Amino acid sequence: MQDLYQLIGEKLNDIIPGEWTKIYLYAEVLDDSTMVLFHFRTPENNQIIYSQDIPSHYNVSKDIFKTLLRELRELFEELRTEHRNNNDDVWTNLTLTLDRSGEFQLDYNYDDILASELDGYERIAIWEYKNLGILPEDEDDKEFVISYLGL
């Protein structure tokens, strides 16, 4: 599995065309779907950039970006398969934090997210607040996160 962690780190570095100091990644891998998104900090003003903004922010081809992101999703699918093959509990989502020095932390979540009252957007909004302190721009979504977390 260590090799997979290394490949994931290298793929993230390939996807981000500029300098970064820390990456915050959310991956959700189920039997029939996979979603991976991340934010990263840059050295300039400690700015946080959302992964989906890379093509516009760095003038990168959307096709190349989508290909790299698909390859990243496949690595997380492989990681989940490795856990399953090793008779480990099968996780449904995870948070990965990675700093420029290569230090990383993985937090696996084993909740049955399909049975959760939260939809995918709500899970992401809560994750973004807990990990980055970012509230949604939409007022209704912001109120949901505040209410759900009891802020």
Swiss-Prot record:
Pfam families, A to Z: YezG-like
Domain of life, source organism: Bacteria
Keywords of the record: Coiled coil, Cytoplasm
First-listed, main subcellular location of the protein, grouped into a coarse class: cytoplasm
Gene3D superfamilies recorded: BH3703-like domains (3.30.500.20)
Compartment list: Cytoplasm
Keyword Coiled coil (UniProt): yes
InterPro entries listed in its UniProt record: YezG-like, YezG-like_sf
Cellular component terms (Gene Ontology): cytoplasm
Induction or repression: Expressed on rich and minimal solid media likely in early stationary phase; dependent on DegSU. Not expressed in liquid LB, but only under conditions that promote biofilm formation.
Chain segments annotated as coiled-coil in the UniProt record: 62-90
Mutant lacking the gene: phenotype: Deletion of the yeeF-yezG operon has no visible growth phenotype, however it is out-competed by wild-type cells.
Role this protein plays: Immunity component of one of 6 LXG toxin-immunity modules in this strain. They promote kin selection, mediate competition in biofilms, and drive spatial segregation of different strains, indicating that LXG toxins may help avoid warfare between strains in biofilms. Mediates intercellular competition during biofilm formation; disruption of the operon disadvantages the bacteria, but overexpression of the cognate immunity protein restores growth in competition with wild-type. In situ neutralizes the toxic effect of cognate toxin YeeF.
Assembly and interaction partners: Interacts with cognate toxin YeeF but not with non-cognate toxin YobL. The interaction probably inhibits the toxic activity of YeeF. May bind with a stoichiometry of 2:2 to YeeF.
Protein known as: Immunity protein YezG
UniProt source species: Bacillus subtilis (strain 168)
Name of encoding gene: yezG
